[in-house]
UniProtKB/Swiss-Prot annotation:
NCBIfam families reported in the protein's UniProt record: rpsB_bact
Domain of life: Bacteria
GO biological process: translation
Molecular function GO terms recorded: structural constituent of ribosome
UniProtKB keywords: Ribonucleoprotein, Ribosomal protein
Record has Ribosomal protein as a keyword: yes
A Pfam family hit: Ribosomal_S2
Name of protein: Small ribosomal subunit protein uS2
GO cellular component: cytosolic small ribosomal subunit
Keyword Lipoprotein among UniProt keywords: no
PANTHER family: 30S RIBOSOMAL PROTEIN S2 PROKARYOTIC AND ORGANELLAR (PTHR12534), SMALL RIBOSOMAL SUBUNIT PROTEIN US2M (PTHR12534:SF0)
Family that this chain belongs to: Belongs to the universal ribosomal protein uS2 family.
Length: 232
């Protein structure tokens, strides 16, 4: 089972929070101190909390659970997509569309339309349209792929969310809360941790830190899949 060492977290800058003036007092239990007006996160708490989150994600994956990676900020967008794909999971890495979870029926119709356009693009149907019609269809396909491409094979609601930057993705977190879907999230010092089932106190801006979280999560999920395959 994959585990992450405090030493690796330190070198990835997981302990660097936000400037003190932006802090959320509810993160006080996870803060070690202040350096140069920046809150320092207590890695002695983060390490066991992250490793516990990895253990739980591994269990969900071993039961064939579906995990939705959510991270729409520029620093995380590409890494979110790569990590989710590496462990055969799902992702939202551009704007979260309100109702993606709570209005799944409507989202499912949009996914159906996306797949129809993909088929038409591949079988030459779009080539038979006028130039203007083809441009409109291709733009629509591009837009739908950008917003829904990472969930087009989800097939229903996910069993868990893994979120980079719970503050930015609070609409996704709230929707998951409303539906009773467990939320695993990296929570920085500027964020209210309420609504997060598995809190990972840590830097949610540094690319090295983001890569550390995503690599470990993808490995934990892949190991869970292997466990399931062995049991079968």
């Amino acid at each position: 089972m994959v585990t992450v060492l405090m030493h690796d977290m330190f070198h990835a800058g997981v302990h660097f929070g936000h400037q003190t003036r932006y802090w959320n007092p509810r993160m006080k239990p996870f803060i070690f101190g202040v350096r140069n007006k920046i809150h320092i996160i207590n890695l002695e708490q983060t390490a066991p909390m992250f490793n516990n989150a990895l253990f739980e994600l591994n269990k969900i994956a071993s039961r064939k659970g579906k995990i939705l990676f959510v991270g729409t900020k520029r620093a995380a967008s590409e890494a979110i997509k790569e990590a989710a794909r590496s462990c055969d999971q799902f992702f939202v890495n551009h704007r979260w569309l309100g109702g993606m979870l709570t209005n799944w029926k409507t989202v499912r119709q949009s996914i159906k339309h996306l797949k129809e356009l993909e088929t038409q693009s591949q079988d030459g149907t779009l080539d038979k349209l006028t130039k203007k019609e083809a441009i409109i269809c291709n733009r629509k396909l591009e837009k739908l792929e950008k917003s829904l491409g990472g969930i087009k094979d989800l097939g229903g609601l996910p069993d868990a969310l893994f979120v980079i930057d719970a503050e930015r993705e609070k609409i996704a977190v709230k929707e998951a809360n409303n539906l009773g879907i467990p939320v695993f999230a990296v929570v920085d010092t500027n964020t209210d941790p309420n609504g997060i089932d598995f809190i990972i106190p840590g830097n949610d801006d540094a690319i090295r830190a983001i890569n550390l979280y995503l690599t470990a999560v993808a490995h934990a999920i892949s190991e869970g899949h292997q466990k399931n395959a062995l049991e079968i």
